[in-house]
């Protein structure tokens, strides 16, 4: 039974997170996967694996993805409140599913309520068809799959994609007895496991008990699952290979990161590692999947026999890819998935040991790997060791295994030749498709994420869409196969065309996106180049592909092994077996159409010279940052991880024939080796990871194994440890030629061959002349600097179209690393040679561009017609062409510390301090040479000028196609002065990223512009210590804000003018690496080779102001030794350096009080930050304390400003004073600390001696004793202490006050009576201007009791005459009638009496004088007043009572307490806001309550004696007094209201009522017919009686005389 509970977790010092990880789901429910020992989650004791997170800090997380939940937890405070749901049934189901999947993150769960077990049987068919009516993947009989349905995030169900149950469209392709399972990716979370019980055994094992989700036993296991943010792969697929997606990486806390598989290329054993699991020892199946795609199984070699032995040249069997730890790293708008493989399968260390996990199943325990080895690695990944890796081609698990493998290889070569050829082709294809799969695995394209938020898609569609999609797939297969066969070999072109005509309806796509070419010997022939290039350019164009479907496409076709034999042998075997291959092809249901030709992103040079066998020599896999053109070590002979950068001392060599560039390499014993550079530095593995990406292709993520620390991907940055001699790195510069495929409708193929390691081709941009809407081919390109460009073939686009193209291109950003090391002489020489070659290439390309432009204009109309036809055939599917790579060796230069200028303050690892070179390719500007020939020519000219060291003038903004991005984000030079550079003082895109990440970033305009360019950025949850930025989808938002961006950029130009002046003052220089893209050229329909211009990185040592104007260094300088600690510290964004000029200016203004008050100074000096400390130091420099005693200096200091704030704030200010005093008087005291101690003692002494409420003062001896041993262990001189004591005692310290405050105090002193009306200083003075005067006249006053009913002293009891004035609730007593004049305002105002809630009665008990009334106030004071006669007496009594009854505010309830002593309630002194009738009602209610309370009081027993009796009598007296007072109030208010009513009646009867001059001067008492006088009538009568009152005054004066 499920239950809900609430848990509060607190971060601990040992754990930056909370110690639990979530299941790798893309949406709710968010299930806790495991819990780390000694973590907050473990210490809490209430969290268990399998719990579902419902709320985080009160926020419902059912609408958020797992990444967003982890981000929320990552950014939360120290305390986080989790509301969990614990369902044993759900936990059991998840554990059951995880036990089947062998991987902790392959069960994606969307909703806790929608679980459905289903079992269905389908008949295998060689044709594509929907399974179960499009509701799910077919499963074999008696095989039940757990199906999770999700109501949202089904991006695959778009346009022509047929729906499946939460997994897009799923079809089955079967041959013979094997089932091919193809799963379309979607963001729904579903997992279906299909198992066909077939097996393959080798000599090293007997039986395999488990099959992994990513591999099927004997190729007979097929599985399907989905993942949220994947696009279908565009790679042609081989016959025997099933394309399968893999799930999106899920962020994890640093303690619980997932392992990732190594991707070191290994030899294929039975094609293992690509999608099926060969039988290995049980130890080899512990980690089953690499978390780089969706958990599916793939079948290969449909016609394979069950018991095949591995080939001689095949790699060790690789059952599956291991779970991997994942993190994310900011690379512009791309997400690089940095991953690591766990180092061992042994129990985790104490700090990361899991105490609870959903993976505690027997399947994990019974299948450890051989000798504790790691999970198998994908091709190209680094291995942590050189001897123990099970999938190292040069190291098997044991010597016996090696010998057995060799025997088996010989047997296979003799017995299975046909099968070997088939396997060779498949191995090639498997190695080819790794790049694109990893590209899709780690790239979240902005334009493709947007449809994921559109809500729930229908899970079922009719078979019509399925058949339509299959028809389109077959068409794309035909088109790609035609191109593929054309590029196989020019000599066999006609033969291939004949085969195509015969087999037109049944063609197979071969996955060749990531081909690894080999070279036997030193040289390389044209035939090899042609073969390689034909494979590379096979998937150049796939016009019939929809960009919307890319969101859900198959993701990973990668393999862990390479085919056997050399590339030439494989290609020849591939040509010979064309007919057999055609017969074996089936219609593939997965959208695996090839994309633009960036096929060979790495050039692997293989040499068999030296006579060394593959199993006899082990070399390092280079993971240091190199260029795209850097030759790789033979991956089949690599099993360790070198981390040395390559020097850029190699020059490119041209290649004839096919146009492929020869590679200059250094060989050791016939094999490729790489040495450390001259400086002995090696770069970090995190940077090596980027460079591996650059080699492997477009955004391919190459997970690397880091053996130092699994919790941080940056812990080896700038590691200065030497590598072995066998790991010396070499850099090469190879000409990079970008090609464009011709139109598919023409049936002509453009023989574009790339001579660099990054061969980039761009597809046609289908641009309709009517709408002007471009179908831009875009594919994010990840290199060491992550640069992407959009190359277009649009011929006649409007200005609006060009801007849109520019906008899309600006979505891709660059990251360039800078280091603090000088260039070596050989590097400078190589750089100069490289630049010279570049200039020559520019000139050649300029001529070609001119010729091509003329040809393109002639074919403009024809191409537009063809493009329109393609749009109709493809149903408006946009092309995704891989963009031009920069083939420069920017990584090898920029990531090496010795390649930076001396004194560069930038951190080599901090993105914020790196110089973000924002130079993009022309394609990024929408200025492809085919569509904008003149503009391309302008660009080429500017590039040439930039190479020659000159600044290129910014073109006019009105030129179509030019987009000015902030910071020159789309320009061609680092200063942003190129095309679309945005001005020399603009901020680059990457700097905008760093500023946004910086806590001090507050520039709203810059933030807006950078967000526009990047498509919106959100901080993602880093699973390690790296600071990450996740680029979200905002392509539509970018289009909408295109105009805003242009306007914002103009404003930024003006704002950066100021920054440029300041930056130019700095004397530091930076090495700025510019990454320029390639201008892809269209070859047209004539089949001519389109050779684009090659843009090579330029390394310049120019001042900061000229290269990167407006850049700011947000990281502290890195130490010269390039240590890891410094680099790690500099990586995290630190506050900006103190702006000393600003601090000096502020200190000067504070000292001169320029715009500040004295009370403002302390606030600026007492803050605990660097800037405030700098201001305080500068402020104290304005004081001169030479030859002054400490108390004199302190008095001078405190008179300048008002020292205020808390104790620690005051102490900070005094610290600066102590430092300044000791600087002015060196030697007077032992240290600054001693001065500070004595200063604080003086402050305390001043308070003690001159405090108001301190009875006992400190003596001089005590002052001396208190300071003993505080002068740095010594005593202060006694004479000094005595002099200080006497000085403070004689003259206290004076505190500075603001002038306004001083004036106010003076005014209050002059008018003290206004602030102290009466004896209570806490009561506000009345408003004299608005007060109503009720009565005045001469009276005699006698004080009987002061406040609190205390008797007045005898000296103050005497009768005194005053001129009394009643205004509102205050009775003013003056000497004469002129008391309210300004000259006499303060005269006797202290005698004023507040009469709120007062009572005036006749003093009948006082017999010494006549006409006396008693006034009792609310504070229990009592006065006697004598009037001239009885009428005057009655008038004063009634007037005072009326004012008190009408104006006094209703009382509050009395306090409640446990005291036995009676406490009178406090009565309010404010005036009432009630109307007269409401006031009367209030008094009546209060009267009733008092009467009831008095009755209750009398009913109680009367205490006999003591305090109880006193309290009883006091309370009784109070209640009786209050009853009398309220009865008087009610009586007088009732009479007043009755009189007013009668007066109104009389006025109604008599229009001109008679005057009442004869009516008595008294208020009516009881029910009388007389109208009570108003306050105005009372005043009039008082004036008439003034003459009578003057007579006693005259008599009194005579007596005085």
UniProtKB/Swiss-Prot annotation:
Pfam families per the UniProt record, alphabetical: PDZ_6 (PF17820), PH_9 (PF15410), Sec7 (PF01369)
Compositional bias of kind Acidic residues: 488-505, 526-557
UniProt-listed Gene3D superfamilies: 2.30.42.10, Arf Nucleotide-binding Site Opener,domain 2, Pleckstrin-homology domain (PH domain)/Phosphotyrosine-binding domain (PTB)
KW Iron-sulfur (keyword) present: no
Keywords: Cell membrane, Cell projection, Cytoplasm, Guanine-nucleotide releasing factor, Membrane
Residue ranges of the region described as Mediates regulation of axon branching and microtubule organization: 1-340
Region spans: Disordered: 113-192, 211-322, 339-440, 459-657, 737-780, 872-965, 1040-1126, 1544-1601
Entry's Gene Ontology molecular function annotations: guanyl-nucleotide exchange factor activity; microtubule binding; phospholipid binding
Coiled-coil ranges per UniProt: none
Record SMART domains: PDZ, PH, Sec7
Domain PH: 1332-1445
Record field: compositional bias (Basic and acidic residues): 300-311, 353-362, 1053-1071
Membrane topology of this protein: Peripheral membrane protein
GO BP annotations, alphabetical order: axoneme assembly; compound eye morphogenesis; negative regulation of microtubule polymerization; positive regulation of ARF protein signal transduction; response to alcohol
Domain PDZ span(s) in chain numbering: 6-88
Ranges where the SEC7 domain occurs: 1125-1291
A GO CC term assigned to this protein in UniProt: axon
Localization: Cell projection, Axon; Cytoplasm; Cell membrane; Cytoplasm, Cell cortex
Entry comment describing in which tissues the protein is expressed: Expressed in the head (at protein level).
Free-text disruption phenotype from the record: Viable but male sterile. Results in enhances preference and sensitivity to ethanol. Fails to develop tolerance to repeated ethanol exposures. Increases axon length and axon branching. RNAi-mediated knockdown increases axon length and axon branching. RNAi-mediated knockdown in a subset of lamina neurons results in axonal swellings and disorganized axonal microtubules.
Annotated segments matching region Mediates association to the membrane and rescricts the microtubule-inhibiting activity to the cell cortex: 894-1601
UniProt motif Microtubule elimination domain (MTED): location: 323-340
Major localization class: other
Quaternary organization: Interacts (via MTED motif) with tubulin.
The protein's role, per its UniProt record: Guanine nucleotide exchange factor for Arf6. Regulates axon growth and branching by inhibiting microtubule polymerisation at the cortex. Together with shot, promotes axonal microtubule bundle integrity. Required for normal ethanol-induced tolerance and preference. Probably by activating Arf6, counteracts ethanol-induced sedation.
Name the UniProt record assigns to this protein: PH and SEC7 domain-containing protein
